[in-house]
């Protein structure tokens, strides 16, 4: 059986004993070095998994007759001498063709946010005269993202519903949630896991805007930075401080050779050096993200959508990836192409608030700099002070904080006698205390990874019986 992966994979394939599987399988020997990387970042790199004898099929690779070969295509940077207006024209033709090919004749379910990716998709779907329903979800006690979703839906004349991520949903559904993504990323972060049963009640194909913000923006890096500086910038992007502390601690607990920091640097240097893009660190880091971050983190959590319905990700399209490689970084920076697309087709939508730059829109977001944005920041702070509570901005605040949540967290880490076969109670207690008594913001990632590791071990034990 021959199976080929696209430039950004749309499915996860596992390889074991020269066979390929399109569903979760387990290996026999744990890969503790790779698990440490996973703990520090929240996802695996390359083709690594929890096991030494289990790999995944890499991007642009083909599996045939027991062997994986590739890549058939490489990320590169070959900017053309072309005007911005012509680039936008090309984007319009390409993007709307992708949307038409994927959704023609289908009912579409479009999750909306206050950003640009779903807004851009909304216009492309409208231009193709497709049947669309929309929804937005937001944290209870958090900023009301549905406000922006409703503005966008109304401007496009789409029906819209609003849903709230509630405290403590995780504990009643943790087994199902952990099995859906195989524990390959921590499952507290993806809010869509809160709505598995709601998604089942919908009718249509999910149209997801993931990865538009990576393809159509950059980090604004200088072209003359060194390779070593690129590595350290990349390291700062993907490693979580609390996760690094946890990975470093368990590296020593597990008696692994050398030092975790050296191993991590070597891994990043190796992966980054395989991307043959010189003179454009923005392009190379975008390529790294698309080779590792997209398939090993983003794609894993899209399984929560795929659990109930077919999923399409237009920004994952091969032709769009190839297009990006020919666009000058100047045009890719600061979301210029998407902004111009929205302005051309829907000035009314462009006037709606861009959440990232609230209260500004696509015509005046340039004013979102100090001191021009100071009046709004003052008013917003006063509003939050009057509410007399911290605004919820991350899911762990709703799932880990509070008496009932804390008891559930404690029980899952200590009382179920699953995690201690991998991590000593002493180590779990250390990070539990760092989270509950020291710095919850820094150590929320570490505690979430321990919870995910516990569920992985639980599911592994069940699989072995």
Model segments located where?
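Cysteine-centered catalytic environments shared across enzyme families
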Residues: 1-168, 172-173, 177-180, 451, ...
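Short, solvent-exposed helix-helix connector turns and helix-capping sites enriched
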Residues: 17, 229-234, 346, 439
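Adenosyl-5′-phosphate
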Residues: 23-27, 53-54, 58, 238-465
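Generic recognition of stable, solvent-exposed alpha-helical segments in well-folded globular domains
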Residues: 58, 86, 90, 94, ...
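Conserved aromatic-histidine-acidic binding/catalytic patches
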Residues: 83, 87, 109, 137, ...
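Conserved adenosine/adenylate-binding substructure
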Residues: 105-109, 170-220, 253-311
């Amino acid at each position: 059986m021959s199976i080929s992966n696209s430039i950004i994979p749309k499915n996860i394939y596992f390889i074991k004993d020269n066979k390929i599987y399109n569903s979760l399988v387990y290996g026999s020997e744990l890969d503790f070095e790779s698990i440490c990387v996973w703990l520090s970042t929240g996802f695996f790199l390359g083709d690594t998994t929890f096991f030494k004898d289990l790999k995944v099929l890499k991007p642009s690779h083909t599996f045939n007759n027991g062997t994986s070969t590739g890549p058939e295509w490489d990320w590169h940077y070959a900017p053309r001498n072309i005007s911005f207006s012509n680039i936008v024209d090309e984007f319009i033709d390409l993007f709307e063709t992708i949307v038409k090919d994927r959704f023609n004749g289908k009912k579409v379910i479009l999750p909306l946010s206050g950003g640009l990716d779903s807004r851009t998709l909304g216009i492309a779907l409208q231009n193709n005269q497709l049947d669309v329903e929309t929804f937005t979800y937001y944290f209870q006690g958090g900023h009301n993202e549905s406000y922006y979703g409703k503005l966008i839906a109304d401007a496009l004349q789409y029906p819209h519903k609003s849903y709230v991520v509630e405290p403590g949903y995780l504990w009643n559904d943790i087994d199902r949630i952990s099995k859906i993504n195989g524990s390959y990323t921590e499952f507290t972060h993806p809010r869509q896991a809160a709505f598995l049963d709601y998604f089942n009640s919908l009718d249509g194909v999910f149209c997801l805007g993931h990865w538009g913000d990576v393809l159509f923006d950059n980090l604004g890096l200088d072209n003359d930075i060194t390779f070593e500086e690129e590595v350290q910038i990349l390291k700062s992007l993907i490693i979580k401080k609390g996760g690094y502390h946890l990975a470093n601690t368990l590296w020593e607990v597990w008696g692994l050779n050398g030092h975790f920091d050296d191993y991590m640097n070597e891994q990043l240097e190796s992966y980054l050096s395989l991307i043959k893009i010189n003179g454009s660190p923005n392009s190379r880091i975008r390529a790294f993200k698309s080779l590792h971050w997209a398939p090993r983190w983003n794609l894993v959590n899209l399984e929560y959508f795929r659990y109930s319905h077919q999923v399409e990700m237009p920004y994952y399209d091969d032709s769009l990836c190839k297009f990006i490689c020919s666009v000058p970084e100047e045009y890719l920076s600061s979301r210029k192409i998407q902004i111009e697309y929205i302005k051309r087709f829907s000035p009314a939508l462009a006037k709606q608030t861009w959440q990232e730059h609230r209260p500004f829109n696509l015509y005046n977001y340039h004013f979102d700099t100090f001191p021009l944005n100071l009046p709004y920041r003052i008013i917003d702070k006063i509003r939050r002070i009057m509410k007399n509570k911290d605004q919820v901005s991350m899911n762990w605040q709703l799932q880990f904080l509070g008496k009932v949540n804390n008891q559930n967290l404690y029980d899952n880490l200590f009382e179920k006698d699953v995690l201690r076969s991998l991590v000593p109670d002493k180590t779990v207690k250390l990070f539990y205390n760092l989270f509950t008594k020291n710095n919850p913001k820094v150590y929320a990632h570490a505690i979430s990874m321990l919870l995910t590791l516990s569920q992985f071990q639980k599911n592994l034990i069940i699989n072995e019986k």
